[in-house]
Amino acid sequence: RLSLSISAGAAIVLAVLTGLEPAYSKASPQRVDLVYFEGAGAPARWIADTAWKGLGTEPIPQRLLRAEPFKRDASAWQEIFPGGAYSALAGPNAYFLPQIRVLQDRVAGGLRTLEIGLHASAQADGVVLYVPKEAGLRAIALRGQTLESDGAKVDTRLVCLTPDCRDLEATLTLSSTKSFRLRFAEIRYGLPASGARLKIARGDTAVPSQSGDETVLADSAVLPAH
């Protein structure tokens, strides 16, 4: 399935959390997803994500902090997903990253048309394409569908959570000819074997939520001004 997410800073209300770690129990556990993340040009990292249902990042269990030196990181997701999280270095990069290929880039009638190829691995369970507000997205066409935006200057994320999205060609209609950076990520359910100790450290008063623990591998491409 495909979905288009429009993110605007003014639309997100973050809870300001101070003081001690909230009280959670086996009966009422905290939602904490663990993620192994690799992105182009950045070291691999572990992410502990508590931001579900738009509630923002809250303190993570002390057992996780003892297992890894997690720190609040506003750019933990490298824009693949909005908001921040707790992150810690995870050692050398170990995976091949997905790829973005520019197939055609042209301007006509005041609009920029960008055709791209997106390739993820055979292990991908889903993909995410991030288009920044600087691009002025009007529409995305792929697989016979056209998803339209109102052209508002906001960040956009195209999310496809099925394995058949591993290889896509998409056409972006843009109102801007400025330079910008596209980001593309594949999502794999579950963690690499090295994440087993973090799952143990999460303890029994915290549980994964929604799609659960994941491996996220991200690439990016800078589009020059046209």
Listing of model-derived features with the role each one plays in the protein:
Residues 1-40:
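Internal/C-terminal transmembrane anchor helices
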Residues 36-226:
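Extracytosolic and intramembrane catalytic regions of membrane-associated proteins
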